[in-house]
Amino acid sequence: MALAAKLLPSIVAFVALACCVLRSSVASVDHHRKLSGWSIGGATWYGPANGSGTDGGACGYQGDVGQPPFNSMIAAGSPSIYESGKGCGSCYQVKCSGNPSCSGKPVTVVLTDLCPGGACLEEPVHFDLSGTAFGAMAKPGQDDQLRNAGKLPVQYARVPCKWQGVDIAFRVDAGSNQYYLAVLVEDEDGDGDLSAVDLMQSGGSGGGGSWAAMQQSWGAVWKYNSGPAPLQAPMSIRLTSGSGRTLVASNVIPAGWQPGGTYRSIVNFRRED
């Protein structure tokens, strides 16, 4: 009993330490989703000085990156925030203060690409911004001077996407056919990213009336193989955001759909204040 009494304080201290480690591990999983303030990262830029990085990128948005609502304000993220494509569509505020040309004011960018090596691996979180986005961090008239710096330390924060007046769009991949459907999902409000996508066909022998999980193909592209039975349109798509919110785009893929076609829904996640 005396030995147990002596060991008790050590046991209590060990349990307390273990709990702290566990809480730290759990917190790190949600680090980029529930940022409570500014964190430190790095930034470079790529593509034309006043451009949108490169067309396409590892998320699959192609030329849309230069159009509304992206408007060239995009970033290629380090693997830690690209998350094998699950980070596609997420929004961040980024600001710099380590250069005389920095305005110190945050700009909002959306993740549309992967920066897999080089400077993007020199710190835990790195943004390879479009030339437009990098220059937007500058004081008025000093965007070229800021871009000449090449690389800068930045502060960043995960923020909700605010695509006002824009509903979610589904672009059917050119390789889709009557047995295989792949869609690029874009313009999600709020979280911006997705953790799951499901498909419901219309009636018939192809699984109509029930939800079937789609698989992430790459980036923001999700796919479904219907097996021996052809796909039955119209088809509905259910989206689950990174934080677990769900949304259904009913009959968004119409009868007579075409590979390469873009079908815009009438729904979107609405930002939670």
UniProtKB/Swiss-Prot annotation:
Disulfide bonds join C59-C88, C91-C161, C96-C102. Residues 179-265 form the Expansin-like CBD domain. It is found in: Secreted, Cell wall; Membrane. Residues 1-27 form the signal peptide. One of its GO terms (biological process) is sexual reproduction. One of its GO terms (cellular component) is extracellular region. InterPro entries: Expan_Lol_pI (IPR007118), Expansin/allergen_DPBB_dom (IPR007112), Expansin_CBD (IPR007117), Expansin_CBD_sf (IPR036749), LolPI (IPR005795), RlpA-like_DPBB (IPR009009), RlpA-like_sf (IPR036908). Keywords: Cell wall, Cell wall biogenesis/degradation, Disulfide bond, Glycoprotein, Membrane, Secreted, Signal. Residues 56-166 form the Expansin-like EG45 domain. Its main location: secreted. The keyword Disulfide bond applies. Glycans are attached at N50. It is a peripheral membrane protein. May cause loosening and extension of plant cell walls by disrupting non-covalent bonding between cellulose microfibrils and matrix glucans. No enzymatic activity has been found. May be required for rapid internodal elongation in deepwater rice during submergence. Belongs to the expansin family. Expansin B subfamily. This is Putative expansin-B14.
